[in-house]
Amino acid sequence: MHIGQHIKEVMQQQGATATQLAKDICCARTHIHRIFLKDNIDIALLERISTALNHDFFRDLSDEFRAKV
């Protein structure tokens, strides 16, 4: 799973914007766009994004990992 792309997809499905997500996690909008390009992410940052979008990205990653094992 490309986590940055997954975050972007979930955000768009919810009708949220990069600007709103940036406000919710207290960072610059440009940083959000850089996150979308990453295939890995800091756990603390993912926790903040999960809270802001009310989505359990950790479960998504875990489910994908289990499917591979």
Where are these regions (language model features)?
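DNA major-groove recognition helix of helix-turn-helix/homeodomain DNA-binding modules
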Residues: 44-60
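A short, Lys/Arg-rich alpha-helix, primarily the initiator
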Residues: 1-20
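Residues within the helices of the helix-turn-helix
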Residues: 8, 19, 23, 33, ...
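Short, charged recognition helix plus adjacent turn
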Residues: 9, 14-15, 34, 59-69
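Alpha-helical residues within the helix-turn-helix
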Residues: 12, 23, 51
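Recognition helix of helix-turn-helix/homeodomain-like DNA-binding domains
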Residues: 26-41
